[in-house]
Design a protein with these regions (language model features):
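Residue(s) in the substrate-gating loop at a strand-loop-helix junction
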Residues: 36
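A short helix-coil junction within the Rossmann-fold of NAD(P)-dependent oxidoreductases
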Residues: 18-27
Length: 150
């Protein structure tokens, strides 16, 4: 779990810190951080990956305000399951699994055609998980427990 946090969170933090002065001096630009829907809320089989992505989303939200003063956009990309060698190793169902080409198209269009803070896809999955975020823990934990046992 520490390795995952070091790579996903601290690696991204170090990259942003490395370009921070450049963007602020330029007073223009766009920083996009790749998170995941796994960071929306605690999920089974995700005790390392999920928290690292939750930290990235929180980081993106925080620096949004810091960079906005310098006319630098910040966005966060929250993809669902994308077919990669890493997801090929998963031993659980991955609803709405998409191709890397699908993901690239969604990210590109989101960055070019939108001023949205978050680019998330596929909507069938992301909107469901966003709804789960507003539920009280008692209901959320009950529902996820039932869904996982199916």
């Amino acid at each position: 779990n520490k390795f995952v946090m070091d790579v996903n969170y601290f690696g991204t933090l170090n990259c942003v810190k490395a370009v921070e002065k450049y963007f602020k001096d330029k007073r223009n630009g766009h920083i996009s951080i790749v998170s995941s829907i796994a960071g929306y809320r605690g999920l089974p089989n995700s005790s390392g990956y999920g928290p690292s992505k939750a930290a990235l989303t929180n980081f993106a939200e925080s620096i949004y305000f810091d960079f906005k003063k310098f006319n630098v956009r910040v966005s966060v990309v929250s993809p669902g399951f994308i077919k990669t060698p890493l997801t090929d190793k998963n031993e659980f169902d991955m609803p709405f699994l998409r191709s890397p080409e699908y993901a690239a198209d969604k990210v590109y269009k989101g960055l070019v055609n939108s001023n949205s803070f978050e680019i998330h896809f596929p909507k069938q999955l992301t909107l469901t998980l966003k709804f789960l975020r507003i539920l009280p823990y008692k209901i959320y934990l009950f529902l996820v427990d039932k869904l996982v046992k199916r």
